[in-house]
Amino acid sequence: MQHLKNIKSGNPKTKEQYQLTKNFDVIWLWSEDGKNWYEEVKNFQPDTIKIVYDENNIIVAITRDASTLNPEGFSVVEVPDITSNRRADDSGKWMFKDGAVVKRIYTADEQQQQAESQKAALLSEAENVIQPLERAVRLNMATDEERARLESWERYSVLVSRVDPANPEWPEMPQ
């Protein structure tokens, strides 16, 4: 199974490569151990999955045909075409770690950013419910049920606004 790490563009290494660069603007890609991507791509097996991952091991592309890839700035690994590997996608939620395709492990900073995004989304959703209910109350058009609903959504909104994104504990959303 092929595994080409940290593929970067570099200078041609032979006269033939130099001529191709000069005549056709070919960009040469080299793995960290000096392997030529264009030669190595021929060695990938047709019955495997090819995974491209970044410097943080996050999967950024998946294909069965290595010749379709432009791996500059990434690493490429070949893995067996088995169910567990086929579950992965390039959504950013998967990684290649310790020789295996696994669900992504988020850093504490990433988890906090996700919590901040979720907090903003929940507050926005609450405001969308609260606004028409407030209007109904202000115009003396609200039913008792709408007044009670407004109060529960306002309480929820306050509780969400107090959530610490570093250690989120989300309140239950009203019905």
Swiss-Prot record:
> Which InterPro entries does this entry report, sorted A to Z?
Phage_T4_Gp38_tail_assem (IPR003458), TFA_Chaperone (IPR051220)
For the biological process aspect of GO, one term held by this record is: virus tail fiber assembly
Is Transit peptide among this UniProt entry's keywords? no
UniProt keywords, alphabetically = Chaperone, Viral release from host cell, Viral tail assembly, Viral tail fiber assembly
Whether Transmembrane counts among this entry's keywords is: no
Instruction: Write down a Pfam family by its short name.
Output: Caudo_TAP
Query: What's the stated role of this polypeptide?
Result: Acts catalytically in the formation of tail protein dimers.
The entry sums up its family as follows:
Belongs to the tfa family.
- What protein name does the entry list? Probable tail fiber assembly protein
Q: Which gene encodes it?
A: G
